[in-house]
């Protein structure tokens, strides 16, 4: 009888210890990155900021938003077509845990029907290239087309040097573009 009571007592004590360790573990992880080593905190913050920007509902193929992080300050840059997107990006980043200050240097592209028509022609020329189906089916298009007063800049990432050249060539063959700058990176 005594052995049975001691066995039940040890099992109960083990369960209580396990539950208390689980609660301590859950409490430490609910604080965000406070329990991570300092070398991982900036990468985690960078991932959370990137995710908050990618989740913006009107962030499209004709917009580019870049960011840099200095301590707890995030600086936003780039070009967007919709004025509201500039402020939505700032608001989304401001709500990320670990961000204390946001500097918004995003430029709003000028309204222009000529630029809108050029954007459409650029999109069709680039994403209808043979072999570019893998880029065109993605929800977040990897090749971004920035048109400002007739000047085109391609930004984003492609899979090879050949894809970069093909995208640049397709863009240069679109009429009414004053210039085309190919800033695509290979990844």
PLM region spans:
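N-terminal targeting leaders
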Residues: 2-187
């Amino acid at each position: 009888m005594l052995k049975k009571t001691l066995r039940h007592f040890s099992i109960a004590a083990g369960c209580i210890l396990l539950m208390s360790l689980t609660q301590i573990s859950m409490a430490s992880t609910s604080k965000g990155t406070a329990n991570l080593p300092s070398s991982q905190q900036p990468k985690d913050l960078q991932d959370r900021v990137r995710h908050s920007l990618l989740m913006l509902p009107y962030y499209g193929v004709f917009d580019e938003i870049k960011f840099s992080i200095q301590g707890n300050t995030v600086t936003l840059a780039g070009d967007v077509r919709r004025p509201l997107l500039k402020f939505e990006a700032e608001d989304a980043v401001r709500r990320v845990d670990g961000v204390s200050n946001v500097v918004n240097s995003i430029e709003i592209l000028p309204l222009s029907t000529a630029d809108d028509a050029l954007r459409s022609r650029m999109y069709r020329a680039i994403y209808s290239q043979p072999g570019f189906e893998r880029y065109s089916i993605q929800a977040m298009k990897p090749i971004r087309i920035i048109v400002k007063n007739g000047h085109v800049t391609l930004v984003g990432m492609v899979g090879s040097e050949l894809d970069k050249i093909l995208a640049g060539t397709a863009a240069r063959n679109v009429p009414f573009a004053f210039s085309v700058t190919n800033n695509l990176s290979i990844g």
